[in-house]
Amino acid sequence: MTFNRRNDRERETSEFEEKMLFVNRTSKTYQGGRRFRFAALVILGDRNGRVGMGIGKAKEVPVAIEKAKAIARKNMITVPVENGTIPHEIVGENSTSRVLLKPAGPGTGVIAGTVPRSIAELAGITNMLSKELGSRNKINVAYAVFDGLKNLRTAKQVREIRGLDGQVRAAQAGGEL
């Protein structure tokens, strides 16, 4: 029985859906002519709250994409998704790019630019509003969206961080703080 490494690799990543957002070609001029290199921006997600982003660079596009996928697997984050949307409004920042992410009601859909929409859909967010502010460079916007999603907290997580878990319940029951 023969084994095919490519099939094994595809089986490994089958839990994640991938989306290639952007391929950039750069060139360097040498005495004999130009040499091209490629950079690929890839998003991986399971549509269930886990999403990762990677940028791979290589002399050929397929190699750059594979590198980007490997980097995206290493940079996975978990996004708190409540009823198909994010728990609260947040602004993600990277360089001169800022992205405003807002929760939306059921049936709204993902109203966003191409980069925030792709990341939100692969994270499992079905209702969200977004606005890109400042620079709209795809790489910087992607990093800004990830910054925003990484800093999201549910109400329960905030209570635990602040140590208010028991006090909030007492206040809701009509007790003293």
Swiss-Prot record:
GO terms for cellular component: small ribosomal subunit. PROSITE patterns: RIBOSOMAL_S5, S5_DSRBD. Transmembrane segments: none annotated. One of its GO terms (molecular function) is structural constituent of ribosome. Pfam families: Ribosomal_S5 (PF00333), Ribosomal_S5_C (PF03719). Keywords: Ribonucleoprotein, Ribosomal protein, RNA-binding, rRNA-binding. Residues 16-79 form the S5 DRBM domain. One of its GO terms (biological process) is translation. Part of the 30S ribosomal subunit. Contacts proteins S4 and S8. Belongs to the universal ribosomal protein uS5 family. With S4 and S12 plays an important role in translational accuracy. The N-terminal domain interacts with the head of the 30S subunit; the C-terminal domain interacts with the body and contacts protein S4. The interaction surface between S4 and S5 is involved in control of translational fidelity. HAMAP family: Ribosomal_uS5_B. This is Small ribosomal subunit protein uS5. It comes from Deinococcus geothermalis (strain DSM 11300 / CIP 105573 / AG-3a).
